[in-house]
């Protein structure tokens, strides 16, 4: 099996993740597994149901992510990937966008795709 291009994989993942987040947050469940962990603004959450419950309970219904940068690195012997994202988060009805950073540690699945093993999200305050 040929090695996938990490930059192409991370770009495709980021596009899929944020378009799903912006339109159908429940649909993110398929990207996580029971061992997955989300740290959202310092709060650690583990497992698919808990992560999706957190993401769907955020105090806004509509938002749009605008991605500024995507950096990735191969991670470890298991062919994982670290993906670091920065950008702006525009909430419906808000004049000013919020700046955010998010880091994903993607791990391969036996089916040849990736799942989110670690996910760390922070708003960046000026």
Swiss-Prot record:
GO terms for biological process: protein import into nucleus. Expressed in roots, stems, leaves and flowers, and, at low levels, in siliques. One of its GO terms (cellular component) is nuclear envelope. Pfam families: NTF2. The keyword Magnesium does not apply. The modification N-acetylserine is found at residue 2. Residues 9-123 form the NTF2 domain. The keyword Cytoplasm applies. Keywords: Acetylation, Cytoplasm, Nucleus, Protein transport, Transport. It is found in: Cytoplasm; Nucleus; Nucleus envelope. SUPFAM superfamilies: NTF2-like. Interacts with RAN1. Facilitates protein transport into the nucleus. Interacts with various nucleoporins and with Ran-GDP. Could be part of a multicomponent system of cytosolic factors that assemble at the pore complex during nuclear import. This is Nuclear transport factor 2B. It comes from Arabidopsis thaliana.
